[in-house]
Amino acid sequence: MRNYEITNILREGNVEETKSAVKELLSKYNFTIQGEEDWGSKRLWHPVGQDEQGHFTLIKCSGSPTEVAKIEHEFKLNVNILKTLVIRANG
């Protein structure tokens, strides 16, 4: 098990539903959520499609390295997630 930090930019409007979908997806792939931060809505540096605002979240979790690519793929399929960054955390 490795530690990861997942930063998501969510589409405005149904933020809570998307956050719960992200948590369900992580539990589906046996990731354990250790912490969560909500950074709020911010104006994007450049538009993503037609969206100029995004809701930023950070999730600290741990899980298997073999499942990370699957999670990233599932995030890309969700239309309410504008951008995702998954990094391996120290420790």
UniProtKB/Swiss-Prot annotation:
CDD domains reported for this sequence: bS6
UniProt keyword annotation of Glycoprotein present: no
Species whose genome carries this gene: Leptospira biflexa serovar Patoc (strain Patoc 1 / ATCC 23582 / Paris)
Gene: rpsF
Family assignment from sequence similarity: Belongs to the bacterial ribosomal protein bS6 family.
Keywords of the record: Ribonucleoprotein, Ribosomal protein, RNA-binding, rRNA-binding
One example of a Gene Ontology biological process annotation: translation
Keyword Ribonucleoprotein: yes
Role this protein plays: Binds together with bS18 to 16S ribosomal RNA.
Lineage: Bacteria, Pseudomonadati, Spirochaetota, Spirochaetia, Leptospirales
Gene Ontology cellular component terms for the protein in this record: ribonucleoprotein complex; ribosome
Name of the protein this chain belongs to: Small ribosomal subunit protein bS6
A GO molecular function held by the record: structural constituent of ribosome
InterPro entries from the UniProt entry: Ribosomal_bS6 (IPR000529), Ribosomal_bS6_sf (IPR035980), Ribosomal_S6_plastid/chlpt (IPR020814), Transl_elong_EF1B/ribsomal_bS6 (IPR014717)
Signal peptide: none
